[in-house]
């Protein structure tokens, strides 16, 4: 994707998610070229975030993209879609998202993700279960709302490939059904990670089997080629 296009890329997560994100990077063939920044889950979290932000500035990062990242609600806590606080296992990466000069892009599907503060809270409250409680208040400069967050990420890559045809082969290098399956299988096997919607450690995302996601990729590819 972006790294193959020659742009500086860093991936940030918190300690509870670090193993899973590292596995996804390996599955994508992005490790070790794409560095992984891990924000502490306890202790001086603010200092940990500040250190990562300083590293991003030094690396020349210009855009921060939050994908399916649970963010702060109005009461300051992050919530899952069931309205349960996940503050104990979720570092406030909102502060990294907003803590530098980068353009901020949020991608989400449930209203509780970083960037959803771009939308009126009343809209989220009226649109999803527990919306009034879980709506994230952290805004983005640009927001992509989608049925599944992965699809929004696919769409962003496809749109950039359309805008930069000279970089399209690089941007689309991991945007194939086979590559997506490899990432998912590595994530499930080595993360280990599962699908909370399916309630199982399975190669599915938000309850949809891989074949559904591969079809979305194929449709985006067809749209780009038409």
Question: What would you call each of these model-derived segments?
Answer:
Residues 91-123:
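Catalytic cores of nucleophile-dependent amide-cleaving enzymes
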Residues 6-16:
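Short internal beta-strands
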Residues 10, 37, 63, 103-107:
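Hydrophobic/aromatic beta-strand patches that form the interior of the parallel beta-sheet core
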Residues 3:
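Gly/Ala-rich phosphate-binding loop of Rossmann-like dinucleotide-binding domains
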Residues 21-97:
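An acidic, phosphate/nucleotide-engaging active-site surface
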Residues 111-226:
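C-terminal functional extensions of proteins
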Residues 14-15, 39-42, 67-70, 107-110, ...:
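Fold-independent oxyanion-binding glycine-rich loops
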Residues 17-22, 114-115:
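Short, charged/polar "capping" segments at the starts of alpha-helices
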């Amino acid at each position: 994707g972006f790294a193959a296009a020659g742009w500086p890329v860093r991936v940030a997560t918190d300690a509870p998610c670090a193993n899973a994100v590292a596995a996804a990077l390996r599955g994508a063939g992005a490790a070790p070229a794409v560095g992984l920044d891990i924000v502490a889950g306890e202790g001086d979290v603010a200092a940990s975030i500040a250190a990562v932000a300083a590293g991003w500035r030094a690396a020349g990062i210009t855009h921060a993209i939050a994908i399916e990242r649970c963010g702060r609600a109005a009461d300051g806590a992050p919530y899952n879609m069931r309205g349960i606080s996940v503050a104990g296992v979720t570092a406030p990466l909102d502060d990294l998202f907003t803590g530098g000069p980068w353009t901020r892009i949020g991608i989400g599907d449930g209203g509780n993700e970083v960037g959803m503060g771009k939308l009126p809270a009343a809209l989220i409250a009226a649109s999803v279960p527990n919306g009034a409680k879980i709506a994230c208040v952290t805004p983005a400069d640009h927001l992509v709302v989608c049925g599944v967050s992965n699809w929004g990420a696919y769409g962003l890559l496809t749109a950039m490939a359309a805008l930069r045809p000279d970089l399209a082969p690089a941007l689309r290098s991991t945007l194939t059904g086979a590559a997506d399956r490899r990432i998912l299988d590595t994530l499930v096997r080595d993360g280990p990670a599962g699908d909370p919607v399916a309630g199982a450690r399975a190669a599915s995302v938000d309850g949809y089997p891989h074949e559904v996601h591969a079809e979305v990729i194929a449709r985006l590819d067809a749209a780009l080629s038409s």
